[in-house]
């Protein structure tokens, strides 16, 4: 009798050992079987007791790296950790029954998820790329902290580039459940037995990588509820994380602004070139081409928008307009410089204004003309006396005496070879003969004097036109330089005074930062 009983006992023990979930399982496996097999857990059902109940889902965001902001694509790339928290009453257990296990780490495809996605993503991927484990506590509290690299859309305001700041946001909501099924909120923490919502983007100083182009000014988090949208719509509520970032302009100042300003101010050197220099126009056109190249480079760096003109674009356009005017001025100056009395007449009003009034106002100096001194007058009168004596001498001497005067004196010859010409008996005849002989010389001298007088007048008139061109050059220098300085300062001071707001939201004095917690 004892044999059959012993055999039956051994068979029963083998059957019990063969049953799943009996022996050979650790406490976690036994707990998982208890939750998912024995209690019949269904991940497709919301963790609520009744249909009208809502699931409270709390969110927080930890920023580990602001990777880049591509202005052309209007895309913000960030490396974040998005923290989900909710309560699933079906995943509760008594820790004493399962070896004091208080937390389980489960794959996310085993439990219910609220399906929170980034609405304003820019790559069409709504799901989180890396599905890390879900932490389930014995009270039913569930947390899920998956890492993600988000490419979110960020509208770019290029008005004050490169002294701009941008307001980029990450908008999270559930595309599967409406406001009647889940309630979104900000995650809460406790401090001194008091709880407060995390109304900011969390940044771990040890794990955060600073961006070389942008600095974070504000990082607020806010729950947005739109009462005008029905609750059965997925757009009724969302949790938005705002990143207000300011550009670090040093790179653009060194590589774009300083070269642009230096090239633009080179246009003032055109007015220091001589009026007859044809390179005046060449220099101005070279500056214009350089500005066009910089404008082309900037247009490739910014989005193609017609909403606003960037600050550096305004400066380049201002400089190009000014340089175009300088080119026109150079052509006018060259035209004035090469004018002559035979083609243009310089009126007295223009002469007085450009040769007397403006040069005094512009502090221009003109070489003074040398006045004939008394010595020159004495020299001229003595020369006239010598000429008269020479004419009288030559009229009384015969030609042979004039030719052999020195030889006759040397050989002691006192007798003339030819009889000297006797002066006429009548003075009227003498004057008539002298007049007839000297008339051609006088006419030639008068012609030379008149020609020299006309030539001097011509040259003087031409010099006056040159002086007018020089005065116009100096006047344009005195006009263009202040306009360039004032215009440059006015344009760039707009960017210097373009600062982000002191608070994240206009009209809201709250700073939404760790230093300004709002306890509940």
Curated annotation (Swiss-Prot):
Disulfide bonds join 154-168. Its main location: membrane. It is a multi-pass membrane protein. Residues 337-474 are cytoplasmic. The keyword NADP does not apply. It holds the Pfam family Neur_chan_memb. The chain crosses the membrane at residues 249-273, 281-299, 315-336, 475-493. Keywords: Cell membrane, Disulfide bond, Glycoprotein, Ion channel, Ion transport, Ligand-gated ion channel, Membrane, Phosphoprotein, Postsynaptic cell membrane, Receptor, Signal, Synapse, Transmembrane, Transmembrane helix, Transport. It is found in: Postsynaptic cell membrane; Cell membrane. It catalyses: K(+)(in) = K(+)(out); Na(+)(in) = Na(+)(out). InterPro entries: Neur_chan_lig-bd, Neur_chan_lig-bd_sf, Neur_channel, Neuro-gated_channel_TM_sf, Neuro_actylchol_rec, Neurotrans-gated_channel_TM, Neurotransmitter_ion_chnl_CS, Nicotinic_acetylcholine_rcpt. Residues 25-248 are extracellular. Glycans are attached at residues 100, 167, 193. The modification Phosphotyrosine is found at residue 393. Residues 1-24 form the signal peptide. One of its GO terms (cellular component) is acetylcholine-gated channel complex. One of its GO terms (biological process) is skeletal muscle tissue growth. GO terms for molecular function: acetylcholine-gated monoatomic cation-selective channel activity; transmembrane signaling receptor activity. After binding acetylcholine, the AChR responds by an extensive change in conformation that affects all subunits and leads to opening of an ion-conducting channel across the plasma membrane. NCBIfam families: LIC. Belongs to the ligand-gated ion channel (TC 1.A.9) family. Acetylcholine receptor (TC 1.A.9.1) subfamily. Delta/CHRND sub-subfamily. Pentamer of two alpha chains, and one each of the beta, delta, and gamma (in immature muscle) or epsilon (in mature muscle) chains. The muscle heteropentamer composed of alpha-1, beta-1, delta, epsilon subunits interacts with the alpha-conotoxin ImII. This is Acetylcholine receptor subunit delta. It comes from Mus musculus (Mouse).
């Amino acid at each position: 009798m004892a044999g059959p009983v012993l055999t039956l006992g051994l068979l029963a023990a083998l059957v019990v050992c063969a049953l799943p979930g009996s022996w050979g399982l650790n406490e976690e496996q036994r707990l998982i079987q208890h939750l998912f097999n024995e209690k019949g857990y269904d991940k497709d059902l919301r963790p609520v007791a009744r249909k009208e109940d809502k699931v409270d889902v709390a969110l927080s965001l930890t920023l580990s790296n602001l990777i880049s902001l591509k202005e052309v694509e209007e895309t913000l790339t960030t490396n974040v950790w998005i923290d989900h928290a909710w309560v699933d009453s079906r995943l509760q257990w008594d820790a004493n029954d399962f070896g004091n296990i208080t937390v389980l780490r489960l794959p996310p495809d085993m439990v219910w998820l609220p399906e929170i996605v980034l609405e304003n993503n820019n790559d069409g991927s709504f799901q989180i790329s890396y599905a890390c484990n879900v932490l389930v506590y014995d009270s039913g509290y569930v947390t899920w902290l998956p890492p993600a690299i988000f490419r979110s859309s960020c509208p770019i305001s290029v008005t004050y580039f490169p002294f701009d700041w941008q307001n980029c946001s990450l908008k999270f909501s559930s595309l599967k459940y409406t406001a009647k099924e889940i309630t979104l909120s900000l995650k809460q923490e406790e401090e001194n037995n008091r709880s407060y919502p995390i109304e900011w983007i969390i940044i771990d100083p040890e794990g955060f990588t600073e961006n070389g182009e942008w600095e974070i000014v504000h990082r607020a988090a806010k729950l947005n509820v739109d009462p005008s949208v029905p609750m059965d719509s997925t757009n009724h509520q969302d949790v938005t994380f705002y990143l207000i970032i300011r550009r670090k302009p040093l790179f653009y100042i060194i590589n774009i602004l300083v070269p642009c300003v230096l090239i633009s101010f080179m246009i003032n050197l055109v007015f220091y070139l001589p009026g007859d220099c044809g390179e005046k126009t060449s220099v101005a056109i070279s500056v214009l081409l350089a500005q066009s190249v910089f404008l082309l480079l900037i247009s490739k760096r910014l989005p193609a928008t017609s909403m606003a003109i960037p600050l550096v674009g305004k400066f380049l356009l201002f400089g190009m307009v000014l340089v175009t005017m300088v080119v026109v001025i150079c052509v006018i100056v060259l035209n004035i410089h090469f004018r002559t009395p035979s083609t243009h007449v310089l009126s007295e009003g223009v002469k007085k204004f450009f040769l007397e009034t403006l040069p005094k106002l512009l502090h221009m100096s003109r070489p003074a003309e040398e006045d004939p001194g008394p010595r020159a007058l004495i020299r001229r009168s003595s020369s006239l006396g010598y000429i008269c004596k020479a004419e009288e001498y030559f009229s009384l001497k015969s030609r042979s005496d004039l030719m052999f005067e020195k030889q006759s004196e040397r050989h002691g010859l006192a007798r003339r070879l030819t009889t000297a010409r006797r002066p006429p008996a009548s003075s009227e005849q003498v004057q008539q003969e002298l007049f007839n002989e000297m008339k051609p010389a006088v006419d030639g001298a008068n012609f030379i004097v008149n020609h020299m007088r006309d030539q001097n007048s011509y040259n003087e008139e031409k010099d006056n036109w040159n002086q007018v061109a020089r005065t116009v050059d100096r006047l344009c220098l005195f006009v263009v330089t202040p306009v360039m300085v004032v215009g440059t300062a006015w344009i760039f001071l707009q960017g210097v005074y373009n600062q982000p707001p002191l608070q994240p939201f206009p009209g809201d004095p709250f700073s939404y930062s760790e230093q300004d917690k709002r306890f509940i």
